[in-house]
């Protein structure tokens, strides 16, 4: 949408009369045109007055009667001028009233921006509070991250300790397995020795029985003519005693060796069992600590995720509020720009009307000088040599408005 305002200036080289044509000021234009016509009429009549004065002067040289007629004519013309001055003053008063009404109607209007101060202050306070909350949340997130890093370091150290303890437990299990295998071997050897002892006892009993049977048979059927020999029962008793002593000794040695081996293995098994129990207790304690650390780590991670979500929501809310505030600021700036444009247009219109008023006041002052008794002959002489020349200038002002904003303002003067 484009508005065009035309300003037409008409000037004379002598007394100047300005005619301005404005689309919104038809009454002012008509009054200004009336002032122009009055000025032109005044100049023409003053010129005719000058010519009449010249002719009157010539006639005064020729006769007194013509001078009296000339003075009468001048009095009539002066009365006509006074009537026109009165009508011009009346038109000037009307024009001033219209200018005043126009300025009151289209004067610069100022919007009251104080109503926006309170919501803007509240928004600034909310932005400040949200900034402080955001900084607090960031600090809490950093603290949570540091705590999570500390717990991660502790968890890694506990994990390494757990792995070392598990390695020790596996080594102890291997020792226990080796001990069990050795115990099984010893039990096998003990069983074999028991079987061997039983076999030896059985052989010994069989040999004793055989010897006894031989002794009994020999005592019944054998007749010895020779001298009596050694006592066989005594010999057999000695042999039996000797074999029983050897068997008892072997049995005692085997039992002592087995007892010593079993005592050693029992001590070693007890020691290994104690170590295994302590390792199990340590593993249980480590498992409990690891579980508590894992639970605490999960809680910290969940708190971190919740804080990050809160931070994202807060940043999104801040961004939306900032966009709203920026939109309000842009709207206010657009309104301010439009108000400034309206004020500039009104100032230009006011200057145009002020120029019209000044020109009219100049013409009124001229008429007042006539009324105050200024020498007409001097005025006629000063205006008799004036050549009236009219220069017409047209000023075209083009304003381009898009969405209530003045995009371009171009002024072109056409001669």
From Swiss-Prot:
One of its GO terms (molecular function) is structural molecule activity. Pfam families: Filament (PF00038). Residues 67-102 are annotated as: Coil 1A. Residues 212-235 are annotated as: Linker 12. Residues 67-378 form the IF rod domain. Phosphorylated. It comes from the Eukaryota. One of its GO terms (biological process) is intermediate filament cytoskeleton organization. Residues 2-66 are annotated as: Head. The record marks 318 as: Stutter. Residues 374-415 are annotated as: Tail. Residues 1-14 have a biased composition (Polar residues). Keywords: Coiled coil, Intermediate filament, Keratin, Phosphoprotein. Residues 1-25 are annotated as: Disordered. Residues 236-373 are annotated as: Coil 2. PROSITE patterns: IF_ROD_1, IF_ROD_2. There are two types of cytoskeletal and microfibrillar keratin: I (acidic; 40-55 kDa) and II (neutral to basic; 56-70 kDa). Heterotetramer of two type I and two type II keratins. Keratin-18 associates with keratin-8. When phosphorylated, plays a role in filament reorganization. This is Keratin, type I cytoskeletal 18. It comes from Scyliorhinus stellaris. The gene is krt18.
């Amino acid at each position: 949408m484009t508005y065009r305002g035309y300003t037409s200036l008409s000037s004379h080289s002598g007394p100047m009369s300005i005619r301005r044509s404005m689309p919104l000021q038809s009454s002012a234009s008509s009054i200004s045109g009336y002032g122009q016509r009055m000025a032109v009429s005044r100049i023409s009549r003053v010129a005719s007055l000058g010519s009449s004065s010249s002719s009157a002067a010539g006639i005064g040289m020729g006769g007194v009667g013509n001078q009296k007629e000339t003075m009468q004519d001048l009095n009539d013309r002066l009365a006509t001028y006074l009537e026109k001055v009165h009508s011009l003053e009346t038109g000037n008063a009307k024009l001033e009233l219209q200018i005043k009404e126009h300025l009151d109607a289209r004067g610069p209007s100022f919007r009251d921006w104080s109503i926006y101060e309170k919501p803007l202050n509240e928004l600034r306070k909310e932005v400040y509070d949200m900034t402080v909350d955001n900084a607090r949340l960031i600090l809490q997130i950093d603290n949570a991250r540091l705590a999570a890093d500390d717990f991660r370091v502790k968890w890694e150290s506990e994990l390494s300790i757990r792995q070392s303890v598990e390695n020790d437990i596996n080594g102890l299990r291997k020792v226990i397995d080796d001990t069990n295998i050795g115990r099984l071997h010893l039990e096998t050897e003990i069983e074999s020795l028991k079987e061997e002892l039983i076999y030896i006892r059985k052989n010994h009993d069989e040999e004793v029985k055989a010897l006894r049977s031989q002794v009994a048979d020999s005592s019944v059927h054998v007749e010895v003519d020779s001298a009596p020999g050694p006592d066989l029962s005594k010999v057999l008793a000695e042999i039996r005693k000797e074999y029983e002593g050897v068997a008892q000794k072997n049995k005692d040695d085997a039992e002592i060796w087995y007892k010593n081996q079993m005592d050693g293995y029992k001590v070693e098994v007890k020691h290994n069992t104690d170590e295994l129990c302590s390792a199990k207790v340590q593993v249980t304690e480590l498992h409990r600590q690891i579980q508590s650390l894992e639970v605490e780590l999960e809680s910290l991670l969940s708190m971190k995720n919740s804080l990050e979500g809160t931070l994202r929501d807060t940043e999104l809310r801040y961004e939306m509020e900032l966009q709203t505030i920026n939109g309000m600021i842009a709207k206010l700036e657009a309104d301010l720009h439009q108000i400034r444009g309206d004020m500039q247009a009104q100032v230009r219109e006011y200057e145009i009307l002020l120029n019209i008023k000044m020109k009219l006041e100049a013409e009124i002052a001229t008429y007042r000088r006539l009324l105050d008794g200024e020498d007409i002959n001097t005025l006629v002489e000063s205006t008799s040599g004036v050549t009236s020349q009219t220069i017409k200038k047209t000023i075209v002002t083009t304003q381009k408005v898009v969405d209530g904003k003045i995009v371009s303002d171009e002024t072109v003067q056409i001669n």
